[in-house]
Amino acid sequence: MDSEKIKAGIRPAEWYEKENQAMIPRPERIFTVPERICAWGMIALGYGLFRACPVYEYPLGGILLLWALFGLTLFTLRKGGHPVRGMALAVCLSALPVSLAMFCSGNAMIQTAAFLYGMAAYAYTVYAACGNTLEEGLSDLLPMDLLRAVFVLPFGSFGSLVQAVGGGGIWKKSGKILLRVFGGLSLAMLPTLLAVSLLSYDSKFRSSMNDLVSLDLGDLFGHLLDLGLGLLLALYLFGLYTSATEKRCAALLTAAGCRDVAGRMHSFSPVTICSSACPVLFIYGVFFFSQWENYVSAFRGTLPENILYSEYAREGFFELCAVSFLNLVLLTATGMFTRRSDTGTNRAHPAVRVLHVLLAMCTLVLIATAVSKMFLYIEAYGLTPKRVYATWFMVVLTLVFVLVIVKQFVPRLRLIALSMAVCVGMFALLGLTDVEGRIAAYNVDRYLAGTLEEPDFAGLGASAVPEKIRGGLYHPVHPALTEFHTEDWENSNPFTLTLPELRAKAAVAEWGDMQR
């Protein structure tokens, strides 16, 4: 019987869990040499990743460390017979351009989001490469897979790193001793630093400590803290690897369980759902009728009488955005709670599908009105980051609602997975195009053409410097611009560099040559 299981590719660790549950202890995992190297590498990378935090201060360092983590783990997976294919490969490749946003953009929010996506993509890649996905291919259970990869599997083998770095024989004992010593030193770190701080009132003691330790105590504490946090991150990452390769936690959040929960939620009849949505559709009809002249004028590019640009363009924009998001929630709720037809196709009732199309079309009209109003506002006052991000969000919502409409006619469409892919693609577009630089270029073009009185460069950082020089608006004596031509910038840490800063540096150097 055991030989048949081995021939079928089932390892002992798997059949103990499937047949005997927790009655019989799982056999001790014997880690290979590449896996042990990976374990030590994760400790080093964990320390490095925390040294690079926050990533918006060390964007290039964050990218290199993230790519090193991917490379180390993918090499180990391949050596262990787990090549990255299918969805795992697609998600892995998506992390490459998204992570580059940390270097291409100077926006801290975009850089942080890009790093977080890279880490989430790493977790899913390891999870999917070992065949742990709930369904094959592009599936609407992708959010549940991501949930299992990030929050379940890493803690199923959280302590496996200790065994992996220990090795065998004398190396195993030495590794355990080193970890125990490190644990003891970590526990002693706080009282030791406290004692040093209290005794530093004495000048002779301070002098002795300065002679004994050339490293600044605050810097030393930072390194030790990052090392401790890096060890926790390494435990998390290697726990994910171990659980994924052994297919642990297979009984948690299964595909059958997810479908069973979804089936139980389909409890309301289509008549009830459609009736509940009728008042909302009626309100939208009244809204479109009452505001027809004012709001539709945005499409014509003209203003209603006795209304200012700022008043018209800003009035109601965020309310329209909120209503659009509310409609997305309504569509999700009606899809989740409506009882399915008895044909066995699991499709929603035709009346519910018509309701979804009507809600989506109403939302597209609201989005188009809001975006048109924003374009009028931009035409009058130029671009700012907030205006661009608000418009970007509305475009993303538009694409999602278009997918909702297509879903009603193409039941096999993976709406959730494709919506997530749209969001990732749009975020990559936002991060890789240096939005701040394009905002500055647009404002300077309008300024030079005489259609914009005063360009707004607030919040654009280094991205605005080349455009300020082009528009004759660069004033190096201004305190806010000194960072772009001082020696501190010249001697800055290379891991802090971004593409906008490199462009600004080149533009300032060229401007300086022209002034001589």
PLM regions: where:
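N-terminal signal-anchor module of multipass membrane proteins
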Residues: M1-K79
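Transmembrane-helix bundle segments that line or gate the permeation/cavity pathway
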Residues: F50-S207, D226-A250
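Terminal, non-globular segments
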Residues: Q111-A113, Y117-Y122, F221-C258, R264, ...
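Short aromatic-rich membrane-water interface segments that cap or initiate transmembrane helices
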Residues: V213-G228, E305-F325, L383-F393
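Internal/C-terminal transmembrane anchor helices
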Residues: C274-A277, L281, L413-E436
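Membrane-embedded alpha-helical segments of integral membrane proteins
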Residues: L358-K407
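Hydrophobic alpha-helical transmembrane segments in integral membrane proteins
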Residues: A428-L452
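Extracytosolic and intramembrane catalytic regions of membrane-associated proteins
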Residues: A458-R516
